[in-house]
């Protein structure tokens, strides 16, 4: 769900095209963006051929993909992908160039949260995440004058003293909220969709006199685990419809399909 939701929120044309016109396989698309030359060497002419002709690069890109989607910097991606920081930065540059909508959303989100001290999670509901000590961070940012940095380089850099710790915490906080400005929006909107679906489902259960007959056992990320008697055979289709309609309230550019699976146990 998060990838489709991200495509809508970022209004990233490459992601939207892949979901609407392509295979919908983001691993293929990421591999094509990052390892295009390697994929072409194996006979791929487009992203849709990666899974069949270059599965090793589809597998290899996953560590880069997940870290990038969460807004990770080059050192983190290097650690995840087991490559040099320089190579990780090349991956980031390739993805920023390929996913222009996502990159622009991240840039604007970073500027907004640094200026205003909060992130708009979902414009449809007004949910926000606040940078709790943003006023302190902003004042400290103003104090970092050219004179401060000159003194820092001469007397503090590399000493591990209190000033070094203040500088470290300052930039660490900025990096955290830069990542949140992209990640919290998709994750948060996904959570709102799930809550909307669960509310609708609960009301349907009550309205149809299934209270204490159908049970909502667990919600994990974008999955709902329910217990119901086999006599209510159409319940899986009803649940799919409820979840898809909940997603459609918040994801306007493309559908987010739901798929029910029935069994005697559940494994996430």
Q: Locations of the language-model features?
A:
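Conserved catalytic core of nucleotide polymerization and phosphodiester-bond processing enzymes
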Residues: 1-268
């Amino acid at each position: 769900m998060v990838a489709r939701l991200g495509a809508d929120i970022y209004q990233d044309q490459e992601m939207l095209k892949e979901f609407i016109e392509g295979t919908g396989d983001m691993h293929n698309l990421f591999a094509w963006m990052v390892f295009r030359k390697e994929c072409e060497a194996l006979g791929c002419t487009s992203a849709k051929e990666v899974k069949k002709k270059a599965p090793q690069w589809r597998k290899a890109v996953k560590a880069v993909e997940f870290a990038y989607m969460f807004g990770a910097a080059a050192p983190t991606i290097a650690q995840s992908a087991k490559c040099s920081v320089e190579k990780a930065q090349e991956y980031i540059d390739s993805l920023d160039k390929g996913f222009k909508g996502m990159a622009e959303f991240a840039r604007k989100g970073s500027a907004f949260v640094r200026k205003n001290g909060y992130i708009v999670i979902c414009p449809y509901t007004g949910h926000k995440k606040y940078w709790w000590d943003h006023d302190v961070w902003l004042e400290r940012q103003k104090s970092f004058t050219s004179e401060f940095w000159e003194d820092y380089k001469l007397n503090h850099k590399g000493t591990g003293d209190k000033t070094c710790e203040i500088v470290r915490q300052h930039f660490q906080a900025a990096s955290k909220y830069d990542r949140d400005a992209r990640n919290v929006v998709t994750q948060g909107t996904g959570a709102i969709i799930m809550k909307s679906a669960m509310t609708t489902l609960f009301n349907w259960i009550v309205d149809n006199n299934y209270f204490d007959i159908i049970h909502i056992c667990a919600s994990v990320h974008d999955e709902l685990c329910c217990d119901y008697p086999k006599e209510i055979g159409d319940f899986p289709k009803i649940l799919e419809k409820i979840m898809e309609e909940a997603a459609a309230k918040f994801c306007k550019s493309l559908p987010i399909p739901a798929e029910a699976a029935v069994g005697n146990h559940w494994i996430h």
